[in-house]
Amino acid sequence: MSRVNRSGENPVWTGWDVALLALVTLGTILFCILFLTFAAQKLLFHNLSFADIGKMPLLSVIAQGIAYTAVLIYMIVLVVAVYHQNFESAVRWNWPRRWPIFIAGGALLAMALQGFAHFLPIPTDMPIDEFFNTPAEAWSLTIFGVTLAPLIEELFFRGFLYPVLARRLGVVLAIILTAAGFGLIHGPQLGRAWGPVLVIFIVGIALTVTRAVTKSVATGILVHIGYNGTLSALLFWASDGFRHLERLRT
């Protein structure tokens, strides 16, 4: 009970619920990718292999968008139907009155970490770069990055995972572990290079501290949107509105 009092967190769900949520998320993403790859091969790309279609960035973004929507429904059902709680109250949504401040904070975080990244070994070619081969791919990732991605990632890491860890392990360790998990899931798209993964880990620290201090998942989402939106805006500007994406590789 003392751990609950110190952290101020006492979610109705358990660590096992969060573990199952993680498995459901991974399974749903995999299923959507496989299903859309199969459908695309049958309907659109008869001459391409299943593996080549599955690697298409646009298909990946669409599949993840569908999967994230399904995961959001699962989250709501878990809280409302299983635990009979109001979803917004249970995850501590708590929309802030001065919400633009948090978007601006995310923008400042992005600019600061862009400067910090100049002192780190950042690979010139990473898997995420494949999402900027065509304007359609760039736009799809940009839209996803300021809508479903921050919503679902913040709900999972700061809405579901963090309070369980804080109740069990305390605030400080929960912040570190939540940020580590956040960095881990972004590792593959960054080629698992320690420089960019460290940057994402720091972002995770900032987002989790925001959640811990404000007691609001919504504030973390706003900071996340500000961060992703600023990076997308910089890429948009550097590529002349995504019309000259080759400039991003020079």
What are these regions (language model features)?
Residues M1-G15:
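Short, Lys/Arg-rich, polar N-terminal cytosolic tail immediately upstream
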